[in-house]
Amino acid sequence: GATYDVAMRFLHEDPWVRLDLLREAMPNQNIQMLLRGRNTVGYTPYPDSVCRGFVQEAAKSGVDVFRIFDALNDVSQMRPAIDAVLETNTTVAEVAMAYSGDLASPKENLYTLDYYLKLAEQIVESGAHILAIKDMAGLLRPEAASKLVMALRKEFDLPVHVHTHDTAGG
């Protein structure tokens, strides 16, 4: 998500040139990027036309897979990016659920398995090619991961990817 910002602000590089150089150096590798839904790689929501134009340019420059998410799991905020990726007819929409809470805990009453299954249904209906779990805070414990992945695989006929962090070191 912050790749473009970091390239410009800290490395003083053109992110589009950087992407072209990466594609040239790795011609037979899939290149994936993170899109913050309607915010693309920025920090504010953009009009659909800007989102579409960004995705078209990124695809032309060699991005193959777009992992699309919204920090609040608002599929309507992801929709412009999903639609833009689908319109390319050449790239993959990996749409991610931002994981929070602990669905394996009996005390959890918001981020439950049912919550994630309903969210996944919206994501699948949006046209996603891949369903992803984005555990950016490192909260996804093995028991919860097992329950969630098994339920998603049982319910939906899409590949399921898990992206997690272990920032606490546990």
Predicted segments, located by residue:
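Alpha/beta enzyme core
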Residues: G1-Y4, L11-I31, R36, T40-V162, ...
